[in-house]
A protein has these predicted regions:
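A structural signal for isolated positions on well-ordered beta-strands in alpha/beta enzyme cores
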Residues: 93-95, 137, 158, 179
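Active-site neighborhood of HAD-like aspartate-dependent phosphohydrolases
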Residues: 1-58
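Structural recognition of alpha->loop->beta junctions
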Residues: 116-139, 192-201
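Donor nucleotide-activated moiety binding/catalytic core segment of transferases
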Residues: 131-155
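Metal-dependent phosphoesterase signature
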Residues: 36, 43-85
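Short catalytic/ligand-binding loop motif for oxyanion handling, primarily in non-cytosolic enzymes
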Residues: 19-21, 103-107, 147-149, 167-169, ...
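Substrate-recognition element of Asp-dependent hydrolases with the DxDx(T/V) motif
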Residues: 71, 80-120, 141
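Asp-based, Mg2+/Mn2+-dependent phosphohydrolase catalytic module
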Residues: 1, 152-153, 158-159, 163-201
Length: 201
């Protein structure tokens, strides 16, 4: 993705793009006895199980727990730090633009923006340099429309996200090169974006 072109301005999603939740959704849901042990051990499996049982309320509450008090238990995907280091070396600015409400819709009202910011600073990914991510290049958006508007306003040359629907939104800027992050190796063929399976791609 990175070349010698220093006119790049790169944008990254946060959840499931930078942050690797692993089996945390499964672990916390199981701890609360919301799912059986045989449930698929990832975010999608837990979500599909709860929604199939008509318990979208538990799914929403689970997200609040994961993105709030349990966020300290997650780590970045392998290669994220190397990617951002390369951006710092090349003086390529990187923005983190996350679609994340400030408070959960149900359950305890954790400040999810504060939790995510604290995690980012604790992760060592934020540096006060021209390239890479600094404290002034982190944006939390309450809606997908706000997120896409921010991508457009900042005139990002590239954006990485784990959700195809972001790239397929009619408002997504056509000038921005789109990379779908699919670490599970699932390849999505589409003319609007390119799939990558690791940060080394």
């Amino acid at each position: 993705m990175i070349g010698q072109n220093r006119t790049f301005v790169i944008g990254l999603d946060l959840d499931n793009t930078i942050i690797n939740y692993g089996s945390l959704f499964y672990d916390v849901a199981l701890e609360n006895k919301w799912i059986p042990t045989e449930c698929q051990k990832d975010k999608i499996g837990v979500r599909e199980y709860l929604q199939a049982k008509g318990r979208n309320d538990l799914w929403t509450e689970l997200q609040g727990l994961i993105y709030g008090p349990y966020l300290t238990e997650v780590v970045p995907y392998s290669g994220v730090d190397d990617f951002l280091l390369e951006c710092r070396k090349l003086k390529i600015p990187v923005w983190i633009i996350s679609h994340k409400t400030r408070f959960p819709a149900v359950g305890f009202q954790y400040d999810l923006h504060a939790s995510a910011s604290a995690w980012l600073f604790a992760s060592g990914l934020i540096h006060d340099e021209t390239g890479g991510v600094n404290k002034d290049r982190i944006i939390f958006c309450e809606t997908r429309s706000e997120k896409i508007a921010a991508i457009s306003r900042l005139q990002l040359t590239h954006f990485v996200d784990d959700l195809p629907e972001v790239f397929l939104d009619a408002g997504f800027p056509k000038e921005t090169t789109r990379y779908l992050y699919a670490p599970e190796g699932i390849q999505f063929q589409h003319t609007y974006f390119e799939s990558i399976t690791s940060w080394k791609d």
